[in-house]
Amino acid sequence: MKLNIAYPRNGTVKQFEISDEVLRRVQLQDYRLGNEVDGAIFGSEFKGYIFRLRGGSDKDGFPMVPGVLASSRVSLLVKRGAIGFNTFRGYQGERRRKNVRGCVLASDIALVNVTISKVGDQPIEGVTDTTAPRRLGPKRASKIRKLFNLSRTEDVRKYVVRRRVVKSGKKDRLKAPKIQRLITPRVKARRAKKAKDAIAKVRASAAERREYLRLIASNRRALRQRDHSKKHTRKVHAQRAEVAAFQKK
């Protein structure tokens, strides 16, 4: 079995090979993903360490899924974005049947991923005795403010983490990332213009609606007056016909 040990505090990861003799002395079925285990079960060099089980895969590469209480391979109906079904595959709302491993360890697990929760007495070479600094700093404006404890009125462009680019035969230069979600006067003006255009559009639509309703009302009023005039004309003609008939008698 291969064991990937990660130490997020130092940003280091290293893979170790665990022999079958060591695994025979351990009841792997007693552990599942999310549990904290004593590092001594993987060898005497990890004595005193506390590991948290994060993931793994079997010999065929099927990943372990948290929450599936099984020590064997199961077939799950999963949606896009789940373990085993990438987001860029399939259609929106589609579900597929995928084979995954349960969260319980077994003897046929080929790889286990763990993180260090508690450091032991002896350092692990390449994990706890070294530090891998982050190559890139934060890019989003809110995260830069959080890193340097800046207020919303301070300019974050002065605090961007720059890195030095070294190329043979060329002068060294500093490279900085483009700040995302940065609020500048240009952004404020664009948002104000967008809001102003939206308000003007609503007002123009309301004015057109009022004009349309006024036109409809005038047409209906003219139609009622025309109908009333026709009825009055028919009534007058009927009365005149009655008078003429009465006079003939």
Swiss-Prot record:
InterPro entries: Ribosomal_eS6, Ribosomal_eS6-like, Ribosomal_eS6_CS. It comes from the Eukaryota. One of its GO terms (molecular function) is structural constituent of ribosome. The gene is RPS6. This is Small ribosomal subunit protein eS6. Residues 223-238 have a biased composition (Basic residues). It comes from Leishmania major. PROSITE patterns: RIBOSOMAL_S6E. Component of the 40S small ribosomal subunit. Plays an important role in controlling cell growth and proliferation through the selective translation of particular classes of mRNA. Ribosomal protein S6 is the major substrate of protein kinases in eukaryote ribosomes. PANTHER family: 40S RIBOSOMAL PROTEIN S6.
